[in-house]
Every structure is written in structure tokens, then in C-alpha cells.
Amino acid sequence: MSLLRRIVRNSTVSKAVPVAKAFMPYPLGRDPSSLPKLDPVSISYIDSRPISLRYRVRAMIEMSNLDEASKLSRLAVLNGFLVDRDTVFICNSVIGAMCSAKRYDDAISLFNYFFNESQTLPNTLSCDLIIKAHCDQGHVDDALELYRHILLDGRVAPGIETYMILAKALVDAKRFDEACVLARSMSCCSFMVYDILIRGFLDIGNFVKASQIFEELKGLDSKLPGREYHKANAIFNVSFMNYWFKQGKDEEAMEILANLEDAQVLNPIVGNRVLQVLVKHGKKTEAWELFGEMIEICDSETVDIMSEYFSEKTVPFERLRKTCYRKMIVSLCEHGKVSDAEKLFAEMFTDVDGGDLLVGPDLLIFRAMINGYVSVGRVDDAIKTLNKMRISNLRKLAIHQAP
């Protein structure tokens, strides 16, 4: 067994480390002195109302006030606020928000403050956020350096998402040999990681290598976990379906689709991937048919994939899961179907309890409705919605009892 293989296996066994083990700072990909400076924050920065720090930070992030969220979050690692279930959640929330806003230097600066300077123990998500930040900026080697540090340190184990982020970055950089070594180093085979390799090889026209990987994984000695075997093969087949469409061989592509079992296609992961391919290649009839079958199990990704078609047909909203309302409202407004969005928007308010202020429409939904009303000339409704948004935000700030 190779050294790398042993390291990966051992890193997943236990997170415990000897007390005497010296702390090794997490690599940041840059000189810490070059990062944005963080002003000192003390406990006196916040008022004495009995509101949890976690709630305060979430409220600021929801209102897109990331600088205030950053200041508040830095209290999470102080002795007066350390809470096992909240501390790392708060850290990850603000780092993730900074990454979503593409404020990568701020995200890395916060990571350094929380997990190097304050020596709070991160979790896998904490590291994944920074690994992805490096990859998004094209700094793949910096991402790999942090990954290797995690393996050697042993207190945090890389997860499937870690390997997916790195595999995609390596494939995008045409570093296929390294991507293959990375995939083989996983202690537990993930079909999502191998699918990234298959799609990468197909994208550069290496059908033979993609097929070789597929055959190895569906053979009798497949490394795939038994419970994922059929779903994995369906995902791989969809990647080949996309390849044949790109080659202009629709008949071969549709034959793959016809051979997929209903139980496989109606799995959200597989179904979304099929929808993505159908929409990408203009197969509207087939996409709508599948969406109709999936609507009761669809998620926000399904809605996102189908969004460009919503202006063409009526969506059966009564069968839509409420977890999809957010994406659906934004999508409908963008495509001028404000009346349909309005119905879902009103329904979100019916579920809001007087004291449950983080339920119901968030800032993104309010903005979508306001822009939607303006785009169709309903200025009065836009103003009413703006006032509702202000009241909602004020209630978040004025609450007197922690959730």
C-alpha cells in the first residue's frame, strides 16, 4: 500500500491527536500580512439583549451586510461566546458568504483568524470553502497544499466534496494524471469524483480513456459501494449521452436515455443530470416530460435547470415542494411571469409565525419580486413589497428574544 493511500486511510480513522502535538498553521496560499486587516473586536461591541450570536450573524448575512457579519463572527472564538454547536457554524457561515460574494481575500483572512490565530478546530466544510476559493481563482496548487496539510495534520478528514472540488479543478487545468491519482487515493470510492474524470476525458475527445474508467467501475471487481452501484452507472451513462449529443449523434444519445430505468431517472441526482443534458441540447419536449415526472421530488437545482423554459408553459405549482419556492420565484420574475411568482410569494408569508423571523421570504426573494413588479409596470405593488421588506428587516434587528 502506498504512503499516500495509508495517509488517506488513517486520516479517516480518528480525529484525536496527542495533546503534545505542535500546532501546524493551515497554509493560506499567500503571506498572511498581505491579507485584509481585521480590526480587534471585543465583547462590548454588541448590546446586552439575550440574542444568540449565531442569530445575529445569520441576520447580517441575510441582509447582505457582510462587513458587520464579519465583525460579529469574530466574537465566536472568544471565551465568552465559545459554544460547541455554534462556533464553527458561525465561522463557516461568514466565510461561505464572503466566498459567494467573491471576496476571497476576506474569506481567507477570516479563515486565518479563526483557525490559525485563534486555533479553533475547523471541520471539513471550513477547509472545503477555502480549497474551492483557491480553485475558483485558478490557484490549484494552493488548494492542493491545504489538502495535503489536512491529510498530514489528521484532525480533519477530507470528504467527498473535497475530492470533487479538487478533481474538477485538476481536470479544468488539464492535469489529468494528477486527477486520476487523486481519485485512486480515496479511501472510499466516489462515483461523483470518477464522473468528473469521465466527463473531462470526453470533453477532450478521449473516448477510449473515458470508456476504460467506466468499464473498470461497472465490472465484477468494481470499487463502487453496492448501495451506489446502479445510481453511479446511470450517472456515467448520462455523461456519455451528453457526449453523443455533442457529436451530433442524437440517436445514440436517445438510446442511452431510453435504457435508463424509471427508478434511476426519478432519483434527483440522476434526474437533474438528465434534465441538464436535455436542456443543453434543446430537447424541450423530453425535458418537460421528465420535469413533469420529477416535480414532486425536484429540488432547487431542478428548478434552476428548467428556468429558461418557464416562460413557455404553465408549471403545476400545486405539486411543487415548498423548498423550491425560493428558486422558482426568482426564476418566474426573471421570465416575466410575475403573477405566478406572486402566488408563491404570498404562500410563503402564510407559513411565517409571528416570532419565527428567519422563515419566509429572504432579501433575494424580496428583490426579485420588486424587480418583477417594476418590469411589468406594477410600481405600486413594488413599493408595497419594498415596505414589507423593510419591516421584515427591522423585525430581525429589533427582536428581544433569541430563537
Swiss-Prot record:
<protein>
    <recommendedName>
        <fullName>Pentatricopeptide repeat-containing protein At3g60960, mitochondrial</fullName>
    </recommendedName>
</protein>
<dbReference type="Pfam" id="PF01535">
    <property type="entry name" value="PPR"/>
</dbReference>
<feature type="repeat" description="PPR 8">
    <location>
        <begin position="362"/>
        <end position="396"/>
    </location>
</feature>
<feature type="repeat" description="PPR 4">
    <location>
        <begin position="190"/>
        <end position="224"/>
    </location>
</feature>
<keyword id="KW-0496">Mitochondrion</keyword>
<dbReference type="InterPro" id="IPR011990">
    <property type="entry name" value="TPR-like_helical_dom_sf"/>
</dbReference>
<feature type="repeat" description="PPR 5">
    <location>
        <begin position="233"/>
        <end position="263"/>
    </location>
</feature>
<feature type="repeat" description="PPR 6">
    <location>
        <begin position="267"/>
        <end position="297"/>
    </location>
</feature>
<feature type="repeat" description="PPR 2">
    <location>
        <begin position="123"/>
        <end position="157"/>
    </location>
</feature>
<feature type="repeat" description="PPR 3">
    <location>
        <begin position="159"/>
        <end position="189"/>
    </location>
</feature>
<dbReference type="InterPro" id="IPR052308">
    <property type="entry name" value="PPR_domain-containing"/>
</dbReference>
<dbReference type="InterPro" id="IPR002885">
    <property type="entry name" value="Pentatricopeptide_rpt"/>
</dbReference>
<keyword id="KW-0677">Repeat</keyword>
<feature type="repeat" description="PPR 1">
    <location>
        <begin position="87"/>
        <end position="121"/>
    </location>
</feature>
<keyword id="KW-0809">Transit peptide</keyword>
<feature type="repeat" description="PPR 7">
    <location>
        <begin position="321"/>
        <end position="351"/>
    </location>
</feature>
<feature type="transit peptide" description="Mitochondrion">
    <location>
        <begin position="1"/>
        <end position="18"/>
    </location>
</feature>
<dbReference type="GO" id="GO:0005739">
    <property type="term" value="C:mitochondrion"/>
</dbReference>
<comment type="similarity">
    <text>Belongs to the PPR family. P subfamily.</text>
</comment>
